[in-house]
Regions:
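C-terminal transmembrane beta-barrel domains of outer membrane proteins
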Residues: 1-156
């Protein structure tokens, strides 16, 4: 755009396959989304897989990984003063399982449910750019949850 206004975007896709006699990929290699470098309106590993939503538990994040990942971000950055920048952003994505898992319903990747199972978040942030290092502080809010909340509309 110009030296005081910028647009940054990113798309990340990933697929993970088990090999040898394994039926699933190791947990440490599986994908997860959410957090400061992902979908900023959600905490780390709090989304997915698919439309699955675990019961409230201290350990629920352990189940929220998948073998397929889609993630997209777009961010508008504007200069406030010298090295201080403001930003608005929109993040989207989720993880899914490539195989059916009875213990985690609605977690398998299916084309018909794909759009409904995309988590959306938006927010604002401030950046301090020192040329070799950027400090940032972002605040995000969820716009759409990928699981059923029994509410309608996007801001649920």
């Amino acid at each position: 755009m110009d030296k005081n206004n910028k647009i940054a975007s990113r798309v990340a896709l990933g697929a993970l396959f088990a090999y040898g006699n394994a039926t699933i990929a190791p947990y440490s290699e599986q994908f997860y989304v959410g957090g400061a470098n992902s979908i900023r309106a959600f905490t780390v590993r709090s989304i997915g897989p698919g439309g699955y939503h675990p019961a409230e538990s201290r350990y629920s994040y352990l189940d929220q990984t998948g073998t397929f990942r889609f993630e997209a971000n777009v961010e508008y950055r504007f200069r406030i003063f010298k090295s201080i920048w403001g930003a608005t952003f929109l993040d989207a994505g989720n993880v899914w399982l490539m195989r059916k898992d009875e213990a985690r319903p609605n977690s398998q990747l299916e084309l018909k449910t794909f759009p409904k199972q995309i988590a959306l978040g938006t927010g604002v942030g401030i950046r301090y750019d020192m040329d070799i290092l950027v400090f940032r502080l972002d605040f995000g809010i969820p716009l759409h949850l990928p699981y059923d909340t029994e509410r309608s509309g996007y801001y649920n």
